[in-house]
């Protein structure tokens, strides 16, 4: 989602990674970071690989503290594949994850995590102000697509008074 610039994370993705490092350091550097993201058709490396390089080379995270999930193509796959890694690592033990994403994307990510049974807290990194309009539209479309009926009902309920108002000028 946040993409790459060549083989490096975009500023949007780097902000997510920086927030993840902040949490990791705040937690005593005990957790494992899962860098999650596949390789797009126009990308030279997977997002996960680029993320790990950034974390290790730019942020000084030990290589063995970062695991790769490099098969996913969207948010739901990121979460499912990462959950499978966490489930395998924990055995039958309970765990709680922090899912770091951009602040505009936390609601949908947390909703997906809940849907697949992933005990996780959504944590948002800051998004540049210029990107907010695009991000808002993208998330609105994604959330409304996932909840078609409630959004359709709300739209119709909104449309009725608008139609009546418009009709008052025509009649």
Name every feature range the model reports, one short phrase each:
Residues 1-138:
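A structural signal for short, hydrophobic/glycine-enriched beta-strand patches
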Residues 142-171:
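C-terminal single-pass membrane-anchor helix
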């Amino acid at each position: 989602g946040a993409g790459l610039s060549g083989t490096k994370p975009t500023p949007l993705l780097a902000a997510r990674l920086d927030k993840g490092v902040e949490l990791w350091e705040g937690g005593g550097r005990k957790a494992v970071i899962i860098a999650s993201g596949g390789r797009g058709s126009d990308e030279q490396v997977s997002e996960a690989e680029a993320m790990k390089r950034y974390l290790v080379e730019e942020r000084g995270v030990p290589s063995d503290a970062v695991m790769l999930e490099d098969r996913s193509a969207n948010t739901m796959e990121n979460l499912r594949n990462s959950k499978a890694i966490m489930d395998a690592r924990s055995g039958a033990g309970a765990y709680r994850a922090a899912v770091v994403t951009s602040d505009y994307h936390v609601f949908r990510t947390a909703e997906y995590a809940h849907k697949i049974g992933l005990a996780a807290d959504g944590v948002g990194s800051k998004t540049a102000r210029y990107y907010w309009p695009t991000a808002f539209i993208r998330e609105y479309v994604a959330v409304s697509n996932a909840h078609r009926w409630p959004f359709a009902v709300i739209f119709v309920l909104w449309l009725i008074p608008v139609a009546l108002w418009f009709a008052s000028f025509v009649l």
